[in-house]
Amino acid sequence: MVAVVNRKYRASRRLGVNLWGRSKDPFNTRNYPPGQHGAMGYKKLSSFGRQFVAHQKFKCYYVVSSRQLRNVFLKAYRKKGDTGDNLVGALESRLASVVYSAGLVPTMFSARQLVSHKHVTVNGRVVNIPSFSVKPGDIVEVRKRASQLPMVLAAIQSQERRVPDHLDVNTEKLSVKYLAVPKYSDVPYPANMEVNLVVEFYSG
């Protein structure tokens, strides 16, 4: 797990942004790429380069593979409405994303771990699939046996992130009601995610 966290922060520096908005992100004090020549700074990117970085941001932020992100995009593209909004709505509807965005855990990695270890229920039923799609009206809750886990207690105490309006969180019950599928503009990303460039990347 430590190795995963280290790679996470390395990705933040590689992409040139404090991706998760965390105060302890090394990018806050070392805002240059990792590696031997990192101190030389970030290179100016081509149009494709900017698109590629934007798609990498989404991969890292939501902890999904290239294949997973592409599949989500294809579904968003085929759906009526704005493709960027559809993409973000689908990613934010993932169970791990709901747990993370609600502030019940400190990171997306810990959200995936909490779900995978059967510590989360949806409408009273245990769901251990991080990619499970939550629907408006669903109630997501951390099980009592996990309520005293250090990562849960730390997240509730710190309240490090602003909870988006599409989630109704009860910190005492460690539960969250999913009110609606959000659009890109509804999600308080700590970094500039440029979903339009992700759409261009996959549409090119």
From Swiss-Prot:
GO terms for biological process: ribosomal small subunit biogenesis; translation. One of its GO terms (molecular function) is structural constituent of ribosome. PROSITE patterns: RIBOSOMAL_S4, S4. Residues 93-156 form the S4 RNA-binding domain. It holds the Pfam family S4. Coiled coil: none annotated. The keyword Glycoprotein does not apply. GO terms for cellular component: small ribosomal subunit. Keywords: Ribonucleoprotein, Ribosomal protein, RNA-binding, rRNA-binding. Part of the 30S ribosomal subunit. Contacts protein S5. The interaction surface between S4 and S5 is involved in control of translational fidelity. HAMAP family: Ribosomal_uS4_B (MF_01306_B). One of the primary rRNA binding proteins, it binds directly to 16S rRNA where it nucleates assembly of the body of the 30S subunit. Belongs to the universal ribosomal protein uS4 family. This is Small ribosomal subunit protein uS4.
